[in-house]
Amino acid sequence: HCISSAASDVYKRQVFDPIHYGHLFTAEEARIEFKLDEVIFVPCREPVHKRENSISAPEHRYLMTVLAISNNPFFEVSKIELNRPGPSYSIDTVKEFLRKYNYEIKIFFITGADAFLEIESWYKSEELIKLCQFIAATRPGYDLDRLDQGFKEIIKIMEIPALSISSTDIRRRVREGKSIKYLVPYEVEEYIYKNKLYRNKRISKKFLG
């Protein structure tokens, strides 16, 4: 892709296990609302703040993200964290993007409003806040008073519809043999069943197709 000195890059960093329509809608809404040139999805290698018993292999999460965004020319996926060993820190990734484009881009960082409430626990959070513009996605009716006044002055609030979709629920539904159609793109659904992700071997792929 081509980034000019006037360009703005939005950076959406998550586990994506799996990526779903909630992620995609939020990214597209941010691109349109803030007039961004592109959205870069960055699957984490080893998430620091989201310790789960197990997450899918990085390559699976990367390929599902590639499939999910393939029909949107404004979306791309980066392996910047997957290629870097050890825990994934946002500050390292943002700095790497800035160096890559000779500091000629403005980076927007999409996160949920609840996640931003924990920003002070992030590694080098004060420096991170200075390097990029945060976009905090909220649901209708979200109590903005939960955000510190200081935070409200440094972030942009973006309200999105209450899409009740979560990666955790999708994994659970696959384990229980329930349908995930219309929660994830068809290509991602197909990939999950083909690679037997999130389920016991005895569960059939009866919901595919």
Question: At which residue positions do the language-model features occur?
Answer:
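Classical nucleotidyltransferase
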Residues: 60-63, 77-209
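Single conserved hydrophobic/aromatic residue that forms the stacking wall/gate
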Residues: 1-7, 11
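Conserved Rossmann-like nucleotide-binding pocket used by diverse enzymes
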Residues: 11-12, 78
